[in-house]
């Protein structure tokens, strides 16, 4: 009786884990289809970081504070980097 109960509980646990993993994969695949590919996102982030760093360095040479307005679209310049607000 104990062996049967253990076997049933083990199968139930495996089924739950398998179902959860399948749902996560489905969600990930849907997210990847909707948005931009990761490589394009990385390129956009690198461009924002570069523009912000360059503009901050130019302003620092002139003894001015970094303007927070250089980064757009929900980003702000902080520590010479564009960070998501």
Swiss-Prot record:
Propeptide feature: residues: 23-48
Coiled-coil stretches: none
Keyword Metal-binding: no
Tissue: Expressed by the venom gland.
InterPro entries per record: Hwtx-2-like
A GO-annotated cellular component: extracellular region
Sorted UniProt keywords: Disulfide bond, Neurotoxin, Postsynaptic neurotoxin, Secreted, Signal, Toxin
Cleaved signal peptide residues: 1-22
Superkingdom of this protein's organism: Eukaryota
Disulfide bond sites: 52-66, 56-77, 71-82
Example GO molecular function: toxin activity
Subcellular location: Secreted
Protein purpose: Postsynaptic neurotoxin.
Family per record: Belongs to the neurotoxin 12 (Hwtx-2) family. 02 (Hwtx-2) subfamily.
Protein name, per record: U4-theraphotoxin-Hhn1ad
Originating organism: Cyriopagopus hainanus
